Amino acid sequence: MAIGNPEVATMGKENTEAESSNGNESQLSSDLTKSLDLAEVKEDEKDNNQEEEDGLKAEASTKKKKKKSKSKKKKSSLQQTDPPSIPVLELFPSGDFPQGEIQQYNDDNLWRTTSEEKREMERLQKPIYNSLRQAAEVHRQVRKYMRSILKPGMLMIDLCETLENTVRKLISENGLQAGIAFPTGCSLNNVAAHWTPNSGDKTVLQYDDVMKLDFGTHIDGHIVDSAFTVAFNPMFDPLLAASRDATYTGIKEAGVDVRLCDVGAAVQEVMESYEVEINGKVYQVKSIRNLNGHSIGRYQIHAEKSVPNVRGGEQTKMEEGELYAIETFGSTGKGYVREDLECSHYMKNYDVGHVPLRLPRAKQLLATINKNFSTLAFCRRYLDRLGETKYLMALKNLCDSGIIEPCPPVCDVKGSYISQFEHTILLRPTCKEIISKGDDY
């Protein structure tokens, strides 16, 4: 049996111990590496999970926002139908209606724009202003629709009934609280105003007609009166431009403390600067001297003051808070109108007191008029619509008694043509507002 060298054995033992220690160290380092790797993997997984959660939350919040924005869009996307059928109140649920065009007073009244007292007065009058603006918004939407459907060949009575029924829908007609302020005027050619077809009328709108479409709306008796002229033949364009320009001149001149005669002088100067050629003959456009603009009262279309369309009128001044219809008429005829044709417009006398009536039928008709129109103008078609029959004798009796005032059509000479434009303006303490102004005129 061989015996080994002790030094060699010692060295081998040392080597074995060194190898084992090295092995342990490498084992520890590999274990540490694995644990670090596992920690990193877990951290990555945690980060990924967090990112996924954040993504899901963001996606959910985006969906909610989209839903909210969609619901908001749905709420605010209510628009007028074609033909118009949605009441204007539903289109403006806040109850605030669009302002008309604002014009500042001339420099001599500039102090009004800085007066706190004047602005406070405006705030107190806001409910009245809002009623006027609501009536004006109905007027704008109705005339926009009517312009889109007007064409030669239409029966005038169909035209009027379409317009009036649209007004009734959009204004949410409610007796004397909201509705039509006066009958639709659709006067043709040499007829300047106050013509609307009676029941059974077969008049047809022609290509060469010049039609004045004049209608009014009201909320609680606060009336908006506005008119424009329609002509399909471009030959009449200068005639329309004359009255349109003259109307805006009158509006520009109007204001607090302005004399009515000064407005008339400015209107005439502009109107009579125009000429129109019709079928080879040139006519100077004349301002009709016996038709005027007018102040407007509550349930009173023609109040106390008249705004002339020619120079030399009244020295009376316009006053703060007043409502005016500035309307001008340009004619190729004599520039003077007379009553003619069958009467269709009627209106209860605003200042009439108690008048004893003998005819029972007249009393009954007056009760109908008081209930449905009060002192607002009406026409025979409106009485027909209410179911009144065989009323002409009773109506004549009311006219003869001075209770009802007939308003027959007014005409220039035959063969002449007349144009008209009209706006309602409000003389506010700080500025004037063209209540009925729209995109069309």
UniProtKB/Swiss-Prot annotation:
Cofactor(s) needed: Co(2+); Zn(2+); Mn(2+); Fe(2+)
Cell location: Cytoplasm
Protein name: Methionine aminopeptidase 2A
Biased composition (Polar residues): 18-33
Comp. bias intervals (Basic residues): 63-76
Origin: domain of life: Eukaryota
Gene3D superfamilies referenced in this protein's UniProt entry, alphabetically: Creatinase/methionine aminopeptidase superfamily (3.90.230.10), Winged helix-like DNA-binding domain superfamily/Winged helix DNA-binding domain (1.10.10.10)
Protein family according to the UniProt entry: Belongs to the peptidase M24A family. Methionine aminopeptidase eukaryotic type 2 subfamily.
Any GO MF annotation of the entry: initiator methionyl aminopeptidase activity
Entry's Gene Ontology BP terms: N-terminal protein amino acid modification; proteolysis
This protein's GO CC annotations: cytoplasm
Record organism: Arabidopsis thaliana (Mouse-ear cress)
